[in-house]
């Protein structure tokens, strides 16, 4: 059989010049984050399918590269559902592996624990320009510190790194699940619905507020709750615009 020279669709070869740049940037990342006390860790590329499908990954869970069971565990004749065929998959981000890692090793780690991860992740997405099925992610996390100081340190470390890399005039977007929960509760959603609501809300950049409202409605959520929820976000956008103008005029 002739050798297929091109990489699998959605994958790419890294040429020496690009690899040199990547190594330089990763070196800066490690140097900067280590300076803030973050410790590099490594987790397996393959995780238990139950962990990857825990409904915390949003749309990414639909993009898992799943791995068939092997040997005696794989029985095509008796398999009735996908769960009978699959027991593991490639990680789609670094958050799920970190949760498992910390749960398994917390007793032997300092508190708080400041973790740094850099590594490839995989998503069975539709390949398009600038969008690949394998790409690198970098995560920093502080576990065991519930104070806002931990959040501030994450922002400070990241903005320091971006400055070293050469970025200027960038904007840091901050998300706090506690705020989202408070808004959802005020709008009348049940707590059991939060995860589903947030998964849809995560699409806002792609489909806009109107698209989010339509998808919430198509999933059977109460119209009154949707209207109140969307009203909060419209108010936030107006306030954000006013704050940006005010800061620009002041500073």
Language-model segments: what does each one mean?
Residues 45, 120, 174-178:
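A general secondary-structure junction signal
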Residues 50-64:
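Glycine-rich loop at the start of a catalytic domain that most often binds anionic cofactors/ligands
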């Amino acid at each position: 059989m002739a050798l297929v020279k091109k990489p699998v669709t959605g994958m790419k070869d890294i040429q020496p010049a690009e690899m040199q740049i990547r190594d330089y940037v990763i070196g800066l990342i490690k140097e900067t984050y280590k300076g803030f006390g973050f410790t590099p860790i490594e987790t397996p590329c393959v995780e238990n399918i139950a962990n990857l499908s825990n409904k915390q990954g949003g749309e990414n869970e639909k993009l898992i590269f799943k791995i068939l069971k092997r040997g005696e565990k794989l029985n095509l004749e008796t398999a009735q559902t996908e769960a009978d065929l699959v027991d593991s998959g490639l990680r789609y981000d670094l958050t799920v592996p970190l949760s498992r890692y910390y749960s398994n090793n917390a007793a032997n780690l300092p508190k708080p624990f400041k973790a740094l991860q850099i590594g490839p992740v995989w998503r069975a997405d539709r390949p398009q320009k600038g969008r690949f099925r394998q790409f690198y992610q970098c995560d920093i996390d502080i576990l065991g510190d519930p104070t806002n100081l931990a959040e501030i340190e994450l922002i400070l470390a990241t903005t320091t790194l971006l400055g070293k890399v050469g970025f200027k005039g960038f904007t840091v977007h901050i998300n706090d699940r506690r705020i989202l929960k408070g808004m959802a509760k005020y709008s009348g959603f049940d707590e059991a619905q939060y995860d589903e609501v947030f998964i849809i809300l995560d699409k806002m950049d792609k489909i806009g507020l109107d698209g989010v409202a339509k998808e919430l409605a198509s999933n059977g959520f109460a119209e009154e709750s949707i209207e109140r929820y969307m009203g909060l976000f419209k108010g936030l956008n107006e306030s954000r615009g006013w704050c940006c103008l005010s800061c620009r005029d002041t500073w």
